[in-house]
Amino acid sequence: MPTINQLVRKGRTPKVKKTKAPALNGSPMRRGVCTRVYTTTPKKPNSALRKVARVRLNGGVEVTAYIPGVGHNLQEHSIVLVRGGRVKDLPGVRYKIVRGALDTQGVKNRKQARSRYGAKMEKK
């Protein structure tokens, strides 16, 4: 417990909140260029080939971003929009690529949660 004199001299410092997506620099989303598109395997109890991409963001920072949904059209030099959001079973993947924005196409034949995957309403 500090004395009043100590509080007058130093004051209380507010706690600094650490950001979960530092490469975005406080922006909700950032544009970038794919430098490598590949698959990785998840952590222990799970088994799959998860689609990820190395993306060089506008600020020059390179991050690993997850490509959500079934199938994608991304390759090297594709321009993508990256948002925050980690993938729990892929260590080091703290960003996701926005489907249906810039060079990324939306998921085909998607019926539910379409807006998350950039899928248009199906014509009757």
Curated annotation (Swiss-Prot):
GO terms (BP aspect): translation
Keywords: Methylation, Ribonucleoprotein, Ribosomal protein, RNA-binding, rRNA-binding, tRNA-binding
Domain of life: Bacteria
Annotated TM spans: none
Signal peptide annotation: none
GO CC entries: small ribosomal subunit
Molecular function terms, GO-annotated: rRNA binding; structural constituent of ribosome; tRNA binding
PTM annotation (3-methylthioaspartic acid): residues: D89
Ribonucleoprotein as UniProt keyword: yes
Quaternary state and interactors: Part of the 30S ribosomal subunit. Contacts proteins S8 and S17. May interact with IF1 in the 30S initiation complex.
Similarity section: Belongs to the universal ribosomal protein uS12 family.
Protein purpose: With S4 and S5 plays an important role in translational accuracy.
Protein name: Small ribosomal subunit protein uS12
